[in-house]
Amino acid sequence: SSTSRGLGDVYKRQLVDSEDAWDITLGSSNIKVAIIDNGVANNHNDLTIYKQRDVSDNDNDASPAVYYNQNGGWSHGTHCAGLAAADINNGTGIASLGGNAEIIAVKATPSSADGGSIYNSYNGIQWACENGANVVSMSYGSANQSEAIQNLINNYPDVIFIAAAGNDNVSTIFYPAGYQNVIGVGSVDGNDLKSSFSNYNAGLF
């Protein structure tokens, strides 16, 4: 049932047709989803971590610098990892669309820096692609584009790249969402209308 599977509000399930999707598959451990972000709680009991890397601090611990705080929870990266691949039917947290998929956690923010910014996007994307990512999720962005990152993405035609449109309610194209071969994703509300904060332009999904 949808209750035991744990995904939240009914409209969210209907919007993405999660019930129909779950009837087809609950995901596969053969699929590796890379989360490029400010850290992923690597011992979270609702996530299966396949590999992890802190490309900013050059170590193999992708956990956030501040492991948990009341306002930020388990970090933005952990939140994104849960949406992508939280386990299904385990009585914990939410259920994602592909709960059997495994996470490649890539921390691209130095522990000494502001946890709200991504500093090493290129290195994070490259490491994820070199270490088995089938999907690369990038929930960050700015108006600055990089030819080097575009070329890097082009070098991995078999990888699906997904990026956030941004949360500033502007039509400005943000990157990495604006790169070629990247699926840019905006936000909608409970009425399937653009969320008040979501960036918007013709290239978004």
Task: Briefly describe each language-model feature range.
Residues N45, I149-Q150, V170-A177:
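Distinct, well-ordered alpha-helical segments
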Residues T109, S139-G141, V188:
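Conserved residues at the C-terminal ends of beta-strands
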